[in-house]
Amino acid sequence: MGESHAPSKPKLDGELCLRPSSSVFLGDQQLYFTQEYLRTNSLNLKYVVYFTACQFSGPIAVAYSPRPASWYIWIRTISGRILKRDMAFNEPVFMEWTRAHCLLVLNKAGRAHIFSSLGEKISEVIFDSQMSDVHECRTFATSRGDSGIAVMDVDGQVSVVNSVSEPVIWSMKPPYSEMPTAWTAFQPHSQLTHILLIFEAVFLMGCQGESLREQSHAASWVDSNTKYVKCVVDDARSRIAMMTESGKIQIVSIDLSTCFCTVEITDHDIAKCINFGWVGNSAVFVQMSPSLIVFVNVSARRKPGDEVQIYEKMTANAKISIEPDGIRLFESTQVEFVEAASREKIAVLNRNPNEDGAHLYKAAQEMSQGTGHNSFAASTVIQDLYKAIDDCISTACDTWQPEEQKLLLKAARFGMAYTNTTPDTTKLMRAIKEIRVLNELRMVRTGIPLTHRQFRAIGETCVINRLIDMGSYSVAIKVAQWLGGETSENVDRVLLEWVRRSISKVSKSNMKMDQPALEALDEKISAKLLQFPHVSIADAARRAIEAKLPELARLFIRRETDDANHVAVLLQLNDVSAALQKASASQRPQLIHQVVRHLMNSESRSSYELAISRIPLAQCLYQDLVRQEGETRGASSRQMLALLEQASDFERQTLFHFDVAETERNPDERLNALRRAKDAAKSMGDKAIEEILNDVSAFAPLQIQRGQADMSVRDTVIEMAHDTAKVAQLKQQARLTDKQVLLWTIEGLAKKGKMEQLFDLAQKRSPIGYAPFVKACVRYKRLDEIKKYFAKVNGYPDLVAAHLAMKNYVEAAKLAYDRRDRDVLHAVHMKSHEDPTQCPRVGQFLRSLDQN
């Protein structure tokens, strides 16, 4: 490509398209074609070598090679706004966006570079040095919301990173010397990453830590007379679309056990396609060339022998990006989104006579045209008004044109006037907020044409994060205010990120930061922050400190009105004298305490006492602080106790004696401290604490006599469990309940190996069931005794507890499933993660219960 093909300063000439969407029926599916942007010549896709678009309507990245061995990557929004230009790169072979909004670029040698949406390098992943040159790559979504990457080299070895943000590399080598005809990588929900390799009609699958195994259970649907050339996992990670050399498309389950749909295309040689993927949940696309795309209905409702439903669309040098709810076509002069319409949208916009939403929409249209009698007539045939209102709101969220959105929202509001009860407007108000946000994001200046389904999938926090990543701070603040109000935490986050990036940009530049330059930056940032009174300027000062610009931080902090924040930043700057003066001027003792403690921790005693002596209030509070330090040793301890006794502060006296009892190693001194605490509590008049301390101080001497001063009551009962007389004595002394004694006795007998005594105890009717016997035997590895006590277990709660103690998670799950007890089943599922072999089976019970 010549230099003239990529102008150095391309202009943003995209235009938002507000034309109504067109649609076609594809069997039981209706595809909507929405032209999002027109005149997008600045995207300059004609000479692109590599193209990739971020999911959820994020930026695009294109790679040009104007000369041999010379590569440049540009990053733009979908509308054409440039985020990064002429980013040089050496021999890229693969580009893809991760779900974390990062661009991954892989070179021929197997080194993956991770960039932000502004082209800033974040990290890199170096695959095995023994790996040969890269042959192909696949990225896949993870359960954590991130992306993983699988790289196949020219020898067929697959190296995998489960998460690009936390790269740990593992690899898998197929048993055959030839290359697979199709392959993919995916991570089913709550499972390990799987690699699927297809060698003509032989399917091999394996996951981390396992070898590749042939999937013989797929034989029921595999066409062994041809070879499979494409396989693509859907966004839900529950199905795979397969393509054969003979023109057959099959939709199969993720574990390859079931084939849901088979379609055979005879009009096109689809095996020679250049792209293949999903369009929503029930259709796929086959890109035959840059100028032809074939859409195919693969709905599970199709029956064998049904006519194949396809739609051919001519395009102009189209590049395709796949979204969770459709695909986006980037053509020479426009950007178009293709989606399978929702049930509500089909019902309302197609004026279906059997749908209440269509009647309500028609009534609103008649009303807007001034024909009220027709409007009333249309509204009288509505059977379920609430469903009609919901359908109109849902359709308004799914449409692109503001006029149509307004009319649909008016229809919903019109319907609310006819409801028998006071309408709940929560859903309508939320829809209005979200539509306002979506319309702003779709503007050319922002260039994020999110659909409502995409917005709901990623959430408002993720949208704001993406705007921050792209440097669109003003739009991010608007969105945060519209969705969360003026004082939204997201507004603070956007502002502080703008501050951080503004300061970081200056600190990393080579420009000299003299006083006038610092004052100009302070004026710029402070002027913006002062528009939002709830945002602290002290946070900007902290960002300046982190960027090693202390003088800028001092300029910021002059404007801070909160004394606590002002003092905290001055301490971070280690300007203790200024912090002390500010704290003293505020007349707030807690701030002076904060500064004094900082001095005591960071300076020598002579230094901080000299600084404190200059400020009378600080000196007074320092003396009080020394008295309250409460050091439980030497003269300070005696002085503290004397002060407390002089002040008749019985509450603090009690706490003081508690501290002594906790730290004292001598049992006699500990007992004396407890008795003094009891006396102080009595003087305080707190009967509850006095009674507790009375019991403790009565029990403690007996513990000392037995040489068990350091043992708790529980440990003592367990230790003496075989001696029923001593256990009875302990029960009386410590005022224990029958249940406590029985539980601890069972544990003690199992621990000591007193199996005959334990069996005699079990012969009596147990008020706490027999699960504790099983638990104790399992805990202390009395394996020969477990079955004996398990046979006595009865009742649902006891059986579940016993199975859990024995780590029989599947059996426990069966009991909970039979009772339809979701809470217990969920608890069993959480515990079953200890055993990877049982966890999937328990998970099946939980999912089955949720589906029912």
Curated annotation (Swiss-Prot):
Pfam families: Vps16_C, Vps16_N. GO terms for biological process: digestive tract development; embryo development ending in birth or egg hatching; endosomal transport; intracellular protein transport; regulation of vacuole fusion, non-autophagic; vacuole fusion, non-autophagic; vesicle tethering. Disruption phenotype: Viable with a reduced number of gut granules in the adult intestine. Embryos of these adults arrest in early development and lack gut granules. Endosome/lysosome fusion defects in coelomocytes. RNAi-mediated knockdown results in a reduced number of gut granules in embryonic intestinal cells. RNAi-mediated knockdown results in defective endosome maturation with the accumulation of small vesicles near the gut lumen and large endosomes/lysosomes on the basal side of the cell. One of its GO terms (cellular component) is lysosomal membrane. One of its GO terms (molecular function) is actin binding. It is found in: Late endosome membrane; Lysosome membrane. The keyword Lyase does not apply. Keywords: Endosome, Lysosome, Membrane, Protein transport, Transport. This is Vacuolar protein sorting-associated protein 16 homolog. The lineage of its organism: Eukaryota, Metazoa, Ecdysozoa, Nematoda, Chromadorea.
